[in-house]
């Protein structure tokens, strides 16, 4: 926070994207000098992902969460949003939450261990890219594609390949292009002295990509493409 605070004190407008600082309430929270935070609502994203997973398994069965660490606010929010979705359905049981340290190989090992412990596992929520990649590798190795449903948070091209190959069943895409374009627009407005209409918080929407809609314009625009 300190470098951003110094920039602000030197008259440089500050906006944050993807992550907030302080408690995220820039109007009357613990940190108020940034003009705006432009980001996805990660709690809602986790809830959306696991609501879709629960529907995919028919509202019954066991669900496993993989996320990076217990210290990253975005991942904590996704985890907790997923847990809310699970708690709202009587037939679904949370069998565990593991932390992958953003390592796909660790996620693979953790998923393999969970499959041994819970052979009837029905669904996995990979709350970040590496967690989902590792889970997908374990499911593919076990020959359980389509049997264990996987929701992947974030939409790189590999996740879409896994989706098409029926290793992953749904991809929860943030919209980084939209986040970036809004940030540039608000930064320009701030430099021009037009700060009155810059919102203190913008939650950009998610796109849930499945095999049914992956080729639509909306889904294609949400995929994180390398070119």
Model-derived features with residue positions:
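A residue-level marker of the well-folded mature domains of exported/periplasmic proteins
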Residues: 1-227
């Amino acid at each position: 926070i300190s470098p951003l605070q110094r920039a602000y004190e030197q008259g440089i407008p500050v906006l944050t994207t993807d992550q907030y600082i302080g408690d995220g309430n820039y109007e009357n929270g613990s940190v108020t000098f940034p003009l705006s935070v432009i980001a996805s609502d990660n709690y809602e994203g986790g809830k959306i992902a696991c609501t879709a997973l629960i529907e995919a398994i028919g509202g019954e069965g066991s669900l496993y969460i993989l996320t990076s660490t217990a210290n990253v606010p975005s991942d904590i929010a996704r985890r907790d949003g997923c847990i809310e979705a699970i708690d709202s359905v009587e037939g679904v049981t949370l069998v565990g939450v593991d932390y992958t340290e953003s390592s796909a190989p660790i996620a693979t090992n953790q998923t393999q261990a969970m499959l041994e412990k819970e052979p009837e596992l029905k669904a996995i929520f990979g709350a970040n890219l590496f967690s989902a990649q590792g889970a997908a590798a374990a499911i593919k190795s076990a020959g359980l594609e389509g049997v264990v449903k996987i929701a992947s948070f974030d939409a790189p091209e590999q996740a879409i390949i896994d989706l098409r190959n029926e290793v992953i069943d749904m991809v929860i895409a943030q919209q980084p292009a939209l986040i970036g374009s809004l940030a540039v627009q608000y930064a320009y407005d701030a430099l021009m002295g037009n700060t009155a209409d810059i919102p203190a918080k913008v939650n950009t929407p998610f796109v849930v990509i499945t095999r049914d809609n992956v080729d639509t314009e909306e889904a294609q625009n949400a995929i994180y493409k390398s070119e």
